[in-house]
Structure formats: C-alpha cells, structure tokens
Amino acid sequence: GSLITAMRTGAVAALSIQYLRTSSAREYAFMGLGNTARATLLCLMAVLEGPLNIRLLSYKGQELEFMKRFKEYSRLNFSIFENVEDLITGADVVVSCVTVAHGQFASDTCFKSGVLVVPVHTRGFQNCDLFFDQIFADDVAHVEGFKYFNQFKQFDEFARILLKQNPGRTSDQERILAYNIG
C-alpha cells in the first residue's frame, strides 16, 4: 500500500485508541511493524501526551528497525517480546498490523480486563469476538460476514462515538475490540 493509505489507516487506529483506551492506559503492544504500525504510532504521539511504553513483537529484526525509526522520541520507552502471548499479557492496548495469521494469536486469558484491541488487518483475534464486552468497526458491512458477528455482545459503528450517539467505553473493566478496516 501507499504511504497515504498507511497514514490514513494509522490515523483511524490512533483515533480509536484515543477514544476507547482506559483512562490509565500505559502499555501499548504492537505487532506487525511495517508502515501501518509506524503511522499508527506517529498519529498516537500526536493525540496522546506523556511517556508511552511501547511493547514490540520480535520478528525478523523488524523490531530493531522500528525502534531505530523512533529513536529521537524521548517519550517512547521500548521493550521487546519474543512471543505474542507475552506481548499481549499486561498490555492496555494491542495494535495488530500483521497481514497473515494462522489461527488465534493468544488465548482468552491473555487479554486483561480493560484491554483495547485494534486489529488493523482483522486477523488472529476471532476468539475475542466471543467474549469482549464491546466491538466497534468503521462500517457494519466490513464485519457482518465475520463468523461470530451474530454473537458479538455489543456492536456499533465507531462514527457513532464521534457523533456522541454512543458513549464508547463505559468502564475501565470493559474489553473492547475496534476493527479499523478502512
């Protein structure tokens, strides 16, 4: 994809994070560390203040290139994780920009109370569809074909939060999934 597509997608993901994270979110996990993840972090820094703890999934040296790209930003603190379950466990926000997934990324128990998961390319989080408290997407048409769509506990389009027609997160205990497909 183009840089414009990556930036647009990153901006939408950052907006979802800004509106749906818990009030105390500090740990941001990233997997799939290409242009979309980089754009998401750039946009996130524009809308969030203070230091950010950024967890990166180790994969083919991409985590080192990612950290190198952001080395001049002193408010970013990086840590590297060797496997997905460790990356997700304890994270307040999980951003996935991976383009290929074979099965689920992590068991249900890895997703702590209050977590926000933003699977930009939708893959690998099907188990979350069944137990997360709220699920948002840019457009119902993007997700209505999902295997478990009819079993979502609570679903709405993200735009309704921006229009103040849906409060979004109503407690810091809710697990929320935000599908940003574009």
Predicted regions and their residues:
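A glycine-rich, Thr/Ser-enriched phosphate-binding loop motif common to dinucleotide/cofactor-binding enzymes
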Residues: G1-I17
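Glycine-rich adenosine-cofactor-binding loop
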Residues: A13, R21-L44, S58-G61
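Short helix-loop-beta connector
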Residues: L20-E27, E49-G50, K112
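A structural signal for isolated positions on well-ordered beta-strands in alpha/beta enzyme cores
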Residues: A29, N53-R55, S79
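NAD(P)-binding Rossmann-fold cofactor-contacting core
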Residues: V47-K71
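Rossmann-like adenosine-cofactor binding region
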Residues: L76-N150
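Adenosine-phosphate binding glycine-rich loop
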Residues: D129-G182
